[in-house]
Regions:
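Central "turn" residue of the DNA-binding helix-turn-helix
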Residues: 39, 55-56, 67, 129
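Short alpha-helical "packing" element that flanks the helix-turn-helix/winged-helix DNA-binding module
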Residues: 47-48
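Charged, amphipathic alpha-helical coiled-coil/dimerization segments
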Residues: 28, 56, 60, 78-145
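N-terminal leader segment of winged-helix/HTH proteins
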Residues: 1-38, 131, 154
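Short helix-capping/turn signature of helix-turn-helix
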Residues: 51-54, 68, 143
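The alpha-helix within a helix-turn-helix
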Residues: 63
């Protein structure tokens, strides 16, 4: 049996953007595997998560927060509605706008997915205490805002 040669030590420190990109892909892969048993994809899980925190968003508002086109978000919403996870209803103040909220089943599925994702995040951050986790989160959120991709008013 041949052994695989060890990888050479890095001669330079990797760029933070590269490491964050690798982490993003790894997290997406893990979340995809965790939510699939519930019939969700990462975009569906993301949409449900945002709707939990901001019920009543329109398709266009939700698309902006999920970084997808309104057309792509509409496809996600059609699937979520067919699965009974969301409710779409006309906005009270605008006849053409449709507001989206979670159904009771949507809240239950999201809670189950959140438990699985929290477990994964806890494993990923096992070497950090609460203060270290807060410091990491604050630094990452700051980076997001400085690049103009914030989560809304800070």
């Amino acid at each position: 049996m041949s052994s695989r040669p060890s990888e050479p030590a890095l001669s330079v420190t990797p760029r933070i953007g590269y490491v964050v990109g690798r982490l993003d892909r790894a997290i997406r892969r893990e979340i995809s595997a965790l939510v699939a048993p519930f019939g969700l994809t990462v975009p569906k899980y993301t949409a449900l998560s945002i709707l939990r925190d901001r019920p009543g968003l329109s398709n266009a508002q939700l698309a902006r927060r999920c970084y997808v086109t309104p057309q792509s978000m509409n496809e996600v919403l059609i699937a979520l509605e067919a699965d009974g996870l969301i409710v779409r209803s006309p906005a009270a103040n605008h006849g053409r706008v449709v507001e989206v909220t979670l159904s009771e089943r949507g809240r239950e599925v999201l809670a189950a997915c959140d438990r699985a994702v929290t477990h994964m995040e806890n494993a990923m951050l096992a070497d950090l205490d609460d203060a270290g986790r807060k410091q990491l989160l604050d630094a990452l959120v700051g980076c997001v805002y400085r690049l103009g991709a914030g989560f809304g008013p800070r």
